[in-house]
Curated annotation (Swiss-Prot):
<dbReference type="InterPro" id="IPR027417">
    <property type="entry name" value="P-loop_NTPase"/>
</dbReference>
<keyword id="KW-0460">Magnesium</keyword>
<feature type="binding site">
    <location>
        <begin position="186"/>
        <end position="191"/>
    </location>
    <ligand>
        <name>CTP</name>
    </ligand>
</feature>
<feature type="binding site">
    <location>
        <begin position="381"/>
        <end position="384"/>
    </location>
    <ligand>
        <name>L-glutamine</name>
    </ligand>
</feature>
<feature type="binding site">
    <location>
        <position position="222"/>
    </location>
    <ligand>
        <name>UTP</name>
    </ligand>
</feature>
<comment type="pathway">
    <text>Pyrimidine metabolism; CTP biosynthesis via de novo pathway; CTP from UDP: step 2/2.</text>
</comment>
<dbReference type="GO" id="GO:0004359">
    <property type="term" value="F:glutaminase activity"/>
</dbReference>
<feature type="binding site">
    <location>
        <position position="222"/>
    </location>
    <ligand>
        <name>CTP</name>
    </ligand>
</feature>
<dbReference type="GO" id="GO:0005524">
    <property type="term" value="F:ATP binding"/>
</dbReference>
<feature type="binding site">
    <location>
        <position position="139"/>
    </location>
    <ligand>
        <name>Mg(2+)</name>
    </ligand>
</feature>
<keyword id="KW-0067">ATP-binding</keyword>
<comment type="function">
    <text>Catalyzes the ATP-dependent amination of UTP to CTP with either L-glutamine or ammonia as the source of nitrogen. Regulates intracellular CTP levels through interactions with the four ribonucleotide triphosphates.</text>
</comment>
<dbReference type="Pfam" id="PF00117">
    <property type="entry name" value="GATase"/>
</dbReference>
<feature type="active site">
    <location>
        <position position="516"/>
    </location>
</feature>
<feature type="binding site">
    <location>
        <begin position="186"/>
        <end position="191"/>
    </location>
    <ligand>
        <name>UTP</name>
    </ligand>
</feature>
<keyword id="KW-0547">Nucleotide-binding</keyword>
<feature type="binding site">
    <location>
        <position position="54"/>
    </location>
    <ligand>
        <name>L-glutamine</name>
    </ligand>
</feature>
Amino acid sequence: MTRYIFITGGVVSSLGKGLASAALGALLQARGYKVRLAKLDPYLNVDPGTMSPYQHGEVYVTDDGAETDLDLGHYERFTGVAARRGDNITTGRIYSNVIAKERRGDYLGATVQVIPHVTDQIKDFIGAETTDEDFILCEIGGTVGDIESTPFLEAIRQFGNEVGPENALFIHLTLLPYIPTAGELKTKPTQHSVKELLGMGIQANILLCRADRPIPENERKKIALFCNIRPERVIAALDVDSIYQVPVSYHEEGFDTQVLAYFGLPTEGKPDLSRWTSIVERVRKPQGEVTIAVVGKYTSLLDSYKSLAEALTHGGIANNVKVKLDWIDSEIFEDESAVQRLENVHGILVPGGFGSRGTEGKIRAAQFARERKVPYFGICFGMQMAVIESARNMAGIVDAGSTELGKPGNPVVGLLGLMTEWMRGNSLEKRTEGTDVGGTMRLGTYPAKLVPGSKVAEVYGTTDITERHRHRYEVNVYYKDRLEKVGLLFSGLSPTQLPEIVEIPDHPWFIGVQFHPELKSKPFDPHPLFTSFIKAAIEQSRLV
């Protein structure tokens, strides 16, 4: 029998429901249970694919090509369970499905309403595709009291009643602010949040209280009294130095024990947290430090590059070093003298992005790395900019550019040729300039073949790989021979000969990839490209 755990949040947003869900999933796994995590997002977008990174943060892409919330990245990094399209639903998708059913006549002339039609659609999502999981953890986005979240809260209330309290647990994450002038943690915001949730028919069974210090026993009992919860089920979610310390911290607070006790499951014995204690030890006691410059467009909101930052941390864990990230807006390098800021970094990474703003700065960063022999890692747009730089300054194609940015004389990157169609499984995908923007990129996992003896083949330890993609433009294979003659190697190609990886053999470490390797990296299984990149940065640190 599958059991369901619903995680809601109150008081303020950004308390860490996604991390809390991921950490609980990891703890249940460590006790031998099989888990899956899902996210209900209350916005009206069908998916976050067309949302600004400044508003939403990164878009996390799954193997099956879904553009999803960044919390699914936390789920996958903590549990190792590959996320899928069905693990993230939005209000927009729910309403689209309901309206499509109404147009087909599925409701047989009924007046279509939020209750029961929208809530039924949400419940169908929660219960869909369950196989042999012991637990389904379902995070509800937003904060209790938000208008947008109301249908989701009503749906999980109904769902809990339908499966019975023995199979449904409601966890509420709140904030316990410390007021220095009073010298104490204040419980009133938590009390009001629980009351708001109760007004929607949901009694929280466990309270997870975010705090910067331990909760005194008298305060714990006070919360329990006013929130109608047992004192032992008021759990402190303490601030920690590393997010990978959260599972260990939660276990020490008894979180997983109380979850199992609620369901009447055995609580004896300890979970195997050795992988987490080992990771935390490496994070706390690194043997050195390297500085990586991340030259991007959205550096004022670091959530735009959440998986990337974590993957670099994973590379540091694998090499037992601390990775210090220097976030640089690529626009500053459009002033040629500003590139000197890169003089003392040990590696340069140019991540993905869209549009023309800051592109010349990215090209200049790639040029600096190539000419100064600094390790360079270009991801998606960062690979394309590196190829344009090589075309201009190595092959002499001075008007090389991308059709994404205008109409260059030589479209080294563009929506053209092979990039207008490709195979996905047994179906042919086609794109044109007039295709809708949402959900039409090359998305999800695709295979590639690596050149034997190349740097990337050495890094991967194989010549056959699969990686996740999210892009609309591609390096134009027409220029392949011309660029290879001047020292750029196309070391990875798709089965239909789309360029996937480029490298410069005559360079300590210069690799560009069209895909997003950061999406598959985990703290206990770092992606080989990030491990190798940080290793190269360590070597560079000895030269600077």
